[in-house]
Every structure is written in C-alpha cells, then in structure tokens.
Amino acid sequence: YDKENDTHINPYSDQAFYYITYGGDPGLRISPLNEPTGPGDAITTFNDYQFHEVDDFSPAKVGRRWFGNRFDIQDDQSYAFEFPNIVIGSDVEVNINVASASESATSMAVSLNGTAIDPINFGTISGSTLLSYRPSSQNSAPYIVPASGETVTVNLLYNNGSNPSSIGYLDYIRVGAVRQLIAGSEQFSFRYNLAATNFGIGEYSIASASQISQVWDVTNTTAIAAKANNESLNTLTFKAELGSLREYVAVSPQDYYTPVSVSDSGVQNQNIKGTIFKGEDGNFQDIDYLIITAPFLLQPAQRLAQYHIAQRGLKVKVVTLDKIYQEFSSGKQDIGAIRNLVRYIYENASAPENRIKYVGILGDSSIDYKNRLPGNNMVVPTFHTLFSSSTWTSYMSDDFFGMMGADPSNGNDEGLMGSNEKVDVAFGRILADDVTLANAMIDKIVNYEKQASYGNWRNNIIMVSDDVDIDWEFNKLQVTLNELSDRITLEKPFVNVKKIYMDAYEQQTSAGGNRYPDVNAALKNDIEVGALIVNYFGHGGEDGLAQEFIVDKDMASTLFHPGKYPLFITVTCEFSRFDNHTRPTAGEMLYQNPTGGAI
C-alpha cells in the first residue's frame, strides 16, 4: 500500500523490472541476521492484510485515482478474503473506498460477515463535481468487527436513489486481520504491528516451519538479513529489537517466485549520467535546454534542438523516455524518473548560474498512464493530482518536473506540489502524438521567430474580461484586469493595450444560448491583425471561453494569421486541458492550428 497515492497498485506501470548483469564488483549480499541477546517477549501472531483493487475506470476523466467494479446493472456484490489460522475474536479492520456518480442522493449498504454496519452516503454531482468519493466511515477510519472464522466476506449493495443513470464505483477494499504465526509450504510476508510501540526484545516463534528454509528481514531492502533454518526445525525462532515496525518474509524452497523475461528484454549499455554533460569535443559542457520525447518523435526533437543551437546558441540535449526509464526507474514508466533526470542535470552544473534553464517536452499526454482507454495518446506522462472527482480540485501540471530546490518550511525536497513551492526550471510542452503534427508545431515556432514575422503587431496586447454574472466577479475579473492593463500602459508605454470587456458589448440570445457576436468579431480581428499576448480572465471550459463562447472550437481551429501567433494566457478552468483524447479542447485546437491560434 502506498499512502501518497492511496493505492495498492502502482499508478504508472503494472510491471517491475530488475536488471541482471555479470562481472564487475560483487553486488549486495544477504547477511546473517544479527539477533540481540537476552530474553524476549514471545510473538506468535502477526498482522496480515489483503486487498481487492482493480483500476479499470476513470469516471470523471480527471486525476490519477482509478476505479474498478461498477455498481449499475449489478448493484449487489460480495468479496471474500481468506485468512488461514486467524485469531478468533481478534479485530478485523476493513477499509472500503467507494464513489458514486449521480444527480440524486445515493448510498452504499455495507455488511461484514453478514452483519450490517453503517451505510456510506454519497452527495450529488453537479457543475464541477463529477463524482462523489467516500472512504469508509466517511473519515477514512476502518470498520472493525471481531473475527469469527477464516473467511471475511464484504458485501456492498448500491442504492441508486431511484435514478437508473446512477453508477457506483469501488476503489478498493482492504482487510487487516491477526493470524497465528504458523507456516506451511508457501512463502509469506509478516509483520507485528505492536513492535512499533513496544520496547525491549521480541522473540518470534513460527510453528510448522520445517519447510521454511530462511526468514528474511526486508525492512531495509538494501540491507537484507536472514535467519536460516538449516536443521529444518518445526519451530523456528529468532529475536529482534522492538520499538520499530519490521517486515519479514518466510522463504520456502517449494514456493520460489519465478521471474518472467519480457520480450526484447535486452538493454543496450547506456550512461546518461556519464555523457549528458559532454560536448562534441568530449569535454564538460553545461546544458541550457533539455528536450524529452518518445523514441518515435526523436527526429522532430532533434530538428528542434538543432534549430535552437543554430539560432540561439543554446546548449541542447535530447533524451528519449526509454533511456530515462532504464537509468532512473529500473525500466518502468514513472514520472519521478523524468524529474530525477532534470534534477541530476540541475544539481551537477558547473556553477549555480550555469544550471539548466529550459526543458521542452515533445509529446501529448493523457490521464491514462497504462493505455487502458481505446485510442489513448499518452506520449510523455505528466503529473496528475490524486483528487479525481472534480475539475475544481483536480489538475495536471508539468511543474512537478521543474521543482528542484529544498522546501525551507519542512526541510523536504520540492516536488510535493505544495502551494509554497516554486518552479526552478522553465517547462514547456509541444502537444503532438505523431511526427506530422510534431513537425507542424515546430514549423510554427520557426515561422514565429523568422525576421519576416516581426512587426508592430508585437507591441499589441489584448486584455479580455468575462461578463459579470455575480457581484464578486466584478472585482475579480474586470477591476483586476483593468488594473493590470493600466500598469502595463504605465510601465511599458510603447505597448498598445486593447481592452475587450464583454459587459461593454450587447449580449444577444440565440438558439444556442446567450452570445456576444461583436466580441467574437473584435477578438478574431485583433488576433488576426496580430498581438504579442492575449490575456483572458473569466469562466471557461473544454469547449470554449466564457459561457457565451467568445472563443470556441471552430474559431480556434480556423484562425488564420501565419507567423503572428500570440501567447495566450487564460486565467480560467479547463479550456486548455490536454489529457483526455476522447474530448479535444478548444485550447488544444487553438495551439495545434498550424497557421493560426496560439504559439
């Protein structure tokens, strides 16, 4: 179980890889268990847990929390967990995390071993809330029932609130129980939770242990120690200091796990750490700009790198994801590997002033790290929050990769996405999932920077404000934008600030709802004339800006102003989210327009 991700399943990969090599220095070895001397308190039980968790559905299409079993057609489902040699009468702890998508009030009835306990009640969904998520007992505390047998049965019955469109979802069930420390012919893991709070020496006693060859202390996976059962004793004992929680594995030669060799498992020698700072002459060279991409986009990535080397004199390196994963995450997909590469480059510059400044990601992204969704276009992963029930609380961001420094408030390294953290390296992303689109977006960059594209239009800034529907919006939207516009005019008098405040225009009613046709026309004209920046404050969604759609998908994809591409700054909601390939956004279309839209 991973507390940070609140899951028993790795969110990024279903496989773990280990490298096997030979020659060179000896690797780590398992050392004999160092047992304390003196009498010990007998420990004959251990804490075991099991879970049921399947990641098949992302109901809200936001965040990194996925769900398994659906409760719609089959609203009554049971799950059985077996605990051999359970201690009868001991506490069984059950955590149940579930969710509901319904515009009506719904609930989940829960019973453990046939005994009904408090139901889980869900709120309704509306607006930005797309899912009502509830951990067990409403506050993450486990249900506790006495053990009555070796089988623990959890039954869930979803009440859809008389709304046939309601759907319930199971995140996971986790069951913890106390078992007698009795072995068999299979290997098993064990821990004794009270060891963390007790003091002195504990003496573990494993019964029926004749087929157990060793017990490994795996608390520290880089310093494993073993207690051997060379004489095949039926009762195997060993001692350990109490005061901390320790993890053990009882090893049975009859139940060794067999590693699987994946197809094309050979890994070519590589050494990013040893070569990333080498220039063409073989000498040390700091890096200004790193481009990260997938192997199939290597050609356009190298083209972009060569352009910045030739035009800007930047020191640029291109690294593909497969190489990053091989060196920084043992071959599996993990967003931490990308950040660790950037941090390695950042920390090993010749001087602080020579640290890496820019990272460009060439490749689209998706909420689906594991390619479960048909047509998924995951190229380079991004960071997603654990919050997965609302577009208000969930977000994705590449900032995670660029937070390099130490957080002075808690002494921890940055990268936890806290509000007090700052980005130390500038990140950008080219949204492309094939070579053609990647090259088209690079063409856009090249054309934007050509001398022929320069002109007075780069002195123009367009400031756009949503209309005011609620009193507080006046200060937040129009007053704030007006103050910003006046400050720009004062400090940069050569800049032409064009204000487009929707409330200054006539609102019209159409079959599709309220609209501002004059705002659409003015904004389209000003963009095509040319503007360095378009700054928008207000509401927005995947289909456009403002409820009146002053920029919609059609406008975003048909704007035509080659070379004169503005930087769009939108202080709004999910206008430019790019992680759901089943619903392209207006912001994506604005960016991917090859002859217009945003740079």
Task: State where each predicted segment sits.
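Cysteine-dependent hydrolase recognition
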Residues: 1-599
